[in-house]
Structure formats: C-alpha cells, structure tokens
A protein has these predicted regions:
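C-terminal, loop-rich substrate-recognition/catalytic regions characterized by aromatic stacking residues
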Residues: 1-194
Length: 194
C-alpha cells in the first residue's frame, strides 16, 4: 500500500471501462443471461467490511470475504485474471436490469479483488432501490424490468496483475444496511450492464 497525492478529487476521467455480467463472469463483451435469487428478510445477508462510517471499527475497511455464491441469495461474477495491473480512480457504477415480484426492493453491489489463491477482499460497495432510480412520480409494477444504478464512492485503488475482479450482487448487507420488512420475494437480474 502507498499514499498518492492528486491535484484534484475526484481525479479527471481519463478512461471509462465497461464490463458486462455473464452467467458467472465479468466480460469485456456484452453477454446474454440472467440470474435469479430469493431474498428472505428473516435471513438477511450479513455485511462484512465496508467503507461506511456507520459500521463498527472491527467491521470497517477491506476484509476477507466469503467464497463466491456462498449463499443462494448472493450472485457473483468473476473476471479472468488481469494481464496487467488495473488502476481504478474515481466512481464505480453498476447498471442492472432487474425484476422483482414486490413493489420495491434494494440491490447492493460490491467490487472485490480476488487473489490467485482464491481469497477475496472487498474494495467498494453501494446500494440502491428500484424506487430511487425511477423518474419522479412513477411507481414500479411487480414483474416488469427496471433499470437501476448502484453508485459507489470515489476511490483510488490498483488491482495487481494476475488478480481478478469480483462483482457481487445481493439484496442487503445487514447490519450496515437495514433489512426491508417485505415478504419473501424473487429477484431476477436480466442481461445486466456493469
């Protein structure tokens, strides 16, 4: 680790990289596919490591994460090993096409660095709801496809060569984010752009 000094923050954008979600992978090319999971508010996904100022000091920061798809309500997408180091500077946005069987729900996304031995550490995360991304005055109709964007705080991080990027999508990270008191429901990710 090392500190870097920049003349302005966020740093000026020099290049935008788009990655697409495949069935279980992060790809440079658009891939067809969808993933489905069921969110149970009685068994929320626990948060572990975060950049939020609202967590306990023991749970803050970049921490070792569970294996990809360690729960049926967590879907993971992992890139191929990087051929060269990848600097990430600025904001990360995860664009998803989603569908659910309730009036509103939340989606979280987490970016992780995966080491060659399989260990994964969180880098950044964010959350949004379907309602937050709808034009003002519009409501979501269960079963329709909606576009949502999970925005993450600006950052400056370099993922070393031979490491992989891991994108995780889930409904909640409790206690960092409160659970929604909704009924058990099905979530569907459709051809999602990252």
């Amino acid at each position: 680790d090392r500190w870097k000094t920049l003349e302005a923050w966020p740093a000026p954008v020099s290049r935008i990289e788009k990655l697409y979600l495949g069935e279980t992978t992060l790809n440079a090319e658009l891939a067809e596919g969808e993933r489905t999971f069921v969110y149970d508010p009685e068994n929320p996904v626990p948060s572990h490591g975060a950049e939020s100022v609202l967590t306990t000091i023991a749970e803050a920061g970049s921490l070792l994460q569970p294996e990809p798809d360690y729960r049926p309500d967590v879907v993971s997408f992992v890139s191929a090993p990087l051929e060269k180091a990848l600097p990430i500077c600025g904001q990360i946005k995860v664009h998803l096409n989603v569908s659910t069987d309730v009036d509103d729900t939340a989606f979280t996304a987490k970016l992780m660095e995966v080491f060659p031995d399989g260990r994964a550490y969180n880098i950044r995360g964010g959350i949004t709801t379907i309602a937050a991304d709808l034009p003002e005055g519009q409501t979501y109709t269960p079963g329709q496809t909606a576009k949502v964007c999970v925005e993450m705080w600006d950052m400056n991080w370099t993922v070393p060569r031979a490491q992989r990027r891991h994108r995780l999508v889930e409904d909640r990270g409790v206690p960092r984010r409160p659970r929604l008191p909704a009924v058990r429901r099905s979530q569907q990710l459709r051809r999602s752009l990252v």
